[in-house]
Swiss-Prot record:
Residues 1-39 form the signal peptide. Predicted to be exported by the Tat system. The position of the signal peptide cleavage has not been experimentally proven. Belongs to the prokaryotic molybdopterin-containing oxidoreductase family. Interacts with the N-terminal domain of TorC. It catalyses: trimethylamine + 2 Fe(III)-[cytochrome c] + H2O = trimethylamine N-oxide + 2 Fe(II)-[cytochrome c] + 3 H(+). This is Trimethylamine-N-oxide reductase 1. One of its GO terms (molecular function) is trimethylamine-N-oxide reductase (cytochrome c) activity. Mo-bis(molybdopterin guanine dinucleotide) binds at S191. One of its GO terms (biological process) is anaerobic respiration. It comes from Escherichia coli O157:H7. The keyword Signal applies.
Length: 848
């Protein structure tokens, strides 16, 4: 999956010679009643209370309270019965010291442009410039790079951005740059990089982002639910579109059934997750597997199913291919080592009889396997995802209600019955207008690379790597543009990122917060938050419950501009403004998107009101007729008429396609591969004995809302990001709850606040991803992160030659108590604004 596709998406160079610079200072300081529309199967037009401005977000729909021009409070939307605690931090997203207020340019880049001293990136010294000046420089750099280097030197990237169908940073970035010239594209993503590549080879579809079997059917039919590295309760707080949180009602029903003994839940995880805790420790069977040994456990389960004749031979014969090729490996005929429970016990820390008992229980009745994403974010993560499918196939329940497997249960309200409604379009990143620089000569380099390997491209241009059956020659990147993303949060091994950044000529960041990505950029452009503009959004993701108006809460703050206006002005500089806007402004686009929805609805028998009526009076419409769904049911009922998208049309336990790639780290069937580093007696554990998890956070969405002081007050320890550690590990190191500690390995070091908890198995620690990077020595590689970003510690290697995805969870660390003075966190302030003490020199007089 192309990352840019997934997340779509008067020359006045004024200052060339700066004389003396002085520091100017730090920048900073009621239930819904509904009426049925008259048309058949119409949307419900909700009568909304006017107490607060209605808008949406990744964390849910809210009513915003504004006082004296400031967004001061967020209350849950009336229909959200299970609102996220994170909405309390939304006002801070608009008003905080880390807000980007003005266009800024890094000091030395302003002096020398692409010939600047790149080792100064990260020193946080910037000069404020006008919008015209900033956009002129942006345009001039695009021109220079296209003319000097060509498309192989330019990479753009986006990420989670903000909600809204129109104000889509990824799509706007993609379209604007495509109108100027070609660039390097990216494939894959950081969330599901391994699974989304292997699963289409095995079951013919990506699986990870797709709808799951409806929860009512699971609750009715399942007897055993296996949560394998999946924390439903924590992760459903935030979704891609505005969440309705209806899925939490099914979690409440699950809790009741578990308490009544009607369903047994098994959690395979080295941690007692939030979901585990919610369902009750006394009711959940906990399999605290040693980190990164899930595949040995899976193989041992498969071995038990086979050796005890508990597997479904008919399902394997009629719906699968390749079990016969997999079996010799499972039985040890290839390497002399049967992958039985006794073998797995030594690796997993789970005694052999418990493993055998788990296999028997899964085979005894209807079992739903709920797989998360964190386990595949490790070296060889493809193998775990593949083995989930193999286990489900051996059980023979794929396509039955309450049985089989799923990889997306923790995301986008999966399992909530979807409603028959409209899915709005949005602002597309594609365009049929030819670019100004219509140059498709990548000079022998690849035009698309795996996103998790883009730092490799910067550091090792020309290196040839394998990727999903293709050979990729990494391009010599010179310029990167980021909008709606924070690579210093999502990419691994930050000190390696910093080394790569020094080789780039120009970095441009478009954002609303001074993240580390912005601090390490050359040109920083202030974008509005979603609360400073108008938009539309789906309400509910897989549920498709309705459509919500996203009303502007406050005006754009300081000099922030909408991404649409930023890129419109950029495109004007190369005569593509009309091609970018298509002649429409913000409200014009919203009306077009709405009208396209009206036409779509006619084909589905769904009526939408006129836009003006919706926008001015209704603000929300709700769809009817939730539909029950069973994942893979059509395939099970008729595999000939409903084949999977694999070469055989069946589940491929053995893949000839993968085998023919001849990769030593991902072969024709799932296997156990030792990791480059692994805790509990594995490689590297003598020096760094603790496994570090860096899973999704509980109080933010990735790095979004880390700027919220309101939320940080609820979870930080001594002003630091918490590190969770088992009592035994803490005691052995003289660490107590609340201590500031240093977490370190050969790749880096961070400070964090200790939280001692028995929810974490011995040898396991956790720092949530998304913590802002706060180096004590600016842009110097190896600097101590004063706040606690775990990606300072993670390793930047691909999962395998197949997916080339992130291996964040292949990370070992040591932890020690800090003694003496601890440096204060400065990540949540703005930059040091520099003021020139010289005359500006026209660009025409400067030799660059």
């Amino acid at each position: 999956m192309n990352n840019n596709d997934l997340f779509q998406a008067s020359r006045r160079r004024f200052l060339a010679q700066l004389g003396g610079l002085t520091v100017a200072g730090m920048l900073g300081p009621s239930l819904l009643t509904s009426r049925r529309a008259t048309a058949a199967q119409a949307a419900t037009e909700a009568v909304i209370s006017k107490e607060g401005i209605l808008t949406g977000s990744h964390w849910g729909a809210i009513r915003a309270t504004v006082k004296d021009g400031r967004f001061v409070a967020a209350k849950p939307f009336e229909l959200d019965k299970y609102p996220s605690k994170m909405i309390a931090g939304l006002p801070d997203h608009v008003h905080n010291a880390a807000r980007i207020r003005y266009p800024m340019v890094r000091v030395d880049w302003l002096r020398k442009r692409h010939l600047s001293d790149t080792s100064q990136r990260g020193d946080n010294r910037f000069v404020r410039v006008s919008w015209d000046e900033a956009l002129d420089m942006f345009y001039e750099e695009l021109e220079r790079v296209q003319k000097t280097h060509g498309p192989s030197a330019l990479l753009t990237a986006s990420g989670w951005q903000s909600t809204g169908m129109f104000h889509n940073a990824s799509g706007m970035l993609a379209k604007a740059i495509a109108l100027h010239g070609n660039s390097v594209g990216t494939g894959g993503d950081y969330s599901t990089g391994a699974a989304q590549v292997i699963l289409p080879r095995v079951v013919g579809s990506m699986e990870v982002y797709e709808q799951q079997t409806s929860w009512p059917l699971v609750l009715q039919n399942s007897k055993t639910i296996v949560l394998w590295g999946s924390d439903l309760l924590k992760n459903q707080q935030a979704n891609w579109w505005c969440p309705d949180h209806d899925v939490y009602e099914y979690y409440a029903q699950l809790k009741a059934k578990v308490a009544a003994g009607e369903i047994e839940v098994i959690s395979i995880d080295p941690v007692v997750t939030s979901t585990h805790e919610y369902l009750g420790r006394e009711h959940v069977k906990h399999i605290a597997v040693n980190p990164q040994t899930d595949v040995p456990l899976q193989l041992a389960l498969a071995h038990t199913l086979y050796s005890e004749n508990l597997y479904d031979k008919n399902f394997l014969a009629n719906y699968c291919v390749g079990f016969e090729q997999f079996l010799p490996y499972l039985l040890g005929e290839k390497d002399g080592q049967p992958k039985d429970a006794a073998w797995a016990e030594k690796l997993t820390g789970i005694d052999a009889e418990t493993i055998r008992g788990l296999a028997r229980q899964m085979a005894a009745n209807r079992t739903q396997i709920i797989a998360g994403w964190c386990v595949q974010r490790m070296q060889h993560g493809e193998q775990w995802a593949w083995m989930i499918v193999v286990l489900a196939a051996m059980l023979g329940q794929i396509g039955l209600p309450g049985g089989g497997f799923g990889f997306g249960w923790h995301y986008n309200g999966a399992g909530t019955p979807g409603r028959k409604g409209v899915i709005l379009s949005g602002f597309s990143g594609s365009t049929s207008i030819p670019p100004v620089h219509d140059n498709s000569d990548y000079k022998g380099y690849s035009s698309t690379i795996p996103i998790a390997r883009f730092i490799d491209a910067i550091l090792e241009p020309g290196k040839v790597i394998n990727w999903n059956g293709k050979s990729v020659k990494l391009p010599p990147l010179k310029m990167c543009i980021f909008a709606g993303t924070n690579p210093f949060h999502r990419h691994q091994q930050i000190n390696r990122i910093i080394e790569g950044w020094r080789k780039l000529e120009t970095v441009i960041a478009i954002d609303n917060q001074w993240t580390s990505t912005c601090r390490f950029a050359d040109i920083v452009l202030p974008a509005t938050t979603q609360f400073e503009r108008n938009d539309l959004d789906q309400y509910g993701n897989h549920s498709n419950r309705g459509i919500i108006a996203m009303k502007q809460v406050v005006p754009p703050q300081f000099e922030a501009r909408n991404d649409f206006d930023i890129f419109r002005e950029l495109c004007r500089r190369f005569n593509r403004e009309e091609a970018f806007t298509e002649g429409l402004d913000e409200m014009g686009w919203l009306k077009r998107i709405w009208q396209e929805g009206v036409q779509q609805g006619k084909g589905r028998g769904v009526h939408l009101p006129a836009f003006d009526d919706f926008w001015n009076n209704k603000e929300y419409v709700e769809f009817d007729h939730p539909q029950m769904f069973v994942r893979h049911q059509a395939f099970r009922e008729d595999p000939d008429l409903e084949p999977l998208g694999t070469p055989s049309g069946l589940i491929e336990i053995y893949s000839k396609t993968i085998a023919d790639m001849n990769y030593d780290d991902c072969q024709g069937h799932p296997m156990w591969f030792e990791k480059i580093e692994r805790s509990h007696g594995g490689p590297g554990s003598q020096t760094y004995p603790l496994h570090l998890q860096s899973v999704h956070p509980d109080f933010r969405l990735h790095s979004q809302l880390c700027e919220s002081e309101t939320l940080r007050q609820q979870y930080t320890v001594a002003g630091k990001e918490p590190v969770f550690i088992n009592p035994q590990d803490a005691s052995a190191r003289g660490i107590r709850n609340g201590d500031v500690v240093r977490v370190f390995n050969a790749r880096g070091q961070v400070l964090a606040g200790a939280v001692v908890s028995d929810r974490y198995a011995p040898g396991v620690a956790r720092i949530h991803e998304g913590a802002w990077h706060d180096p004590d020595k600016g842009g110097e590689p190896g600097a101590l992160c004063k706040y606690g970003n775990p990606n300072v510690l993670t390793i930047d290697i691909g999962t395998s030659q197949l997916a080339q995805a992130t291996s964040a969870h292949t990370t070992l660390v040591e932890i020690e108590k800090c003694n003496g003075t601890v440096e204060q966190v400065t990540a949540f302030n703005g930059p040091v604004e520099m003021v020139a003490q010289c005359e500006y020199v026209p660009a025409s007089q400067v030799k660059l």
